[in-house]
Amino acid sequence: MATINQLVRKPRVKKVVKSNVPALEACPQKRGVCTRVYTTTPKKPNSALRKVCRIRLTNGFEVTSYIGGEGHNLQEHSVVLIRGGRVKDLPGVRYHTVRGALDCAGVKDRKQGRSKYGVKRPKS
């Protein structure tokens, strides 16, 4: 335990926590415009063509965001909403596009886990 005198000379320093999603600026989601929509390959040992897009956010940041689900309707100039959450096997991809919000349509014929892919409840 430090003495009062030691604390007067050199106070305790708060630890600085670095954000995993700096472009969101402490917001839950951010809006942006797609500048490029493309596929990329994951790190070893995985193999696929992952759908990603480059997005210019309203705060001026340019980030790469993953497009989850099977099939999408995004193209250049689409307005999308992004949330935090990295993709472990894609280096540099720290954000996810929100399906079913703004210009990004929900996943077609999705029956389970619908809320994560912007799909309304089907008529039974």
UniProtKB/Swiss-Prot annotation:
Gene3D superfamilies named in the record: Nucleic acid-binding proteins (2.40.50.140)
InterPro entries: NA-bd_OB-fold, Ribosomal_uS12, Ribosomal_uS12_bac
Coiled-coil ranges from the UniProt annotation: none
GO molecular function, one term: tRNA binding
Keyword Ribosomal protein set for record: yes
GO biological process: translation
Keyword annotations: Methylation, Ribonucleoprotein, Ribosomal protein, RNA-binding, rRNA-binding, tRNA-binding
UniProt-listed SUPFAM superfamilies: Nucleic acid-binding proteins
Residue positions, PTM 3-methylthioaspartic acid: D89
Top-rank lineage group of the source organism: Bacteria
One Gene Ontology term, aspect cellular component: small ribosomal subunit
Subunit structure: Part of the 30S ribosomal subunit. Contacts proteins S8 and S17. May interact with IF1 in the 30S initiation complex.
Family recorded in the similarity comment: Belongs to the universal ribosomal protein uS12 family.
PANTHER family: 30S RIBOSOMAL PROTEIN S12 FAMILY MEMBER
Known function: With S4 and S5 plays an important role in translational accuracy.
UniProt-recorded name of the protein: Small ribosomal subunit protein uS12
Taxonomic source organism: Glaesserella parasuis serovar 5 (strain SH0165)
Taxonomic path: Bacteria, Pseudomonadati, Pseudomonadota, Gammaproteobacteria, Pasteurellales
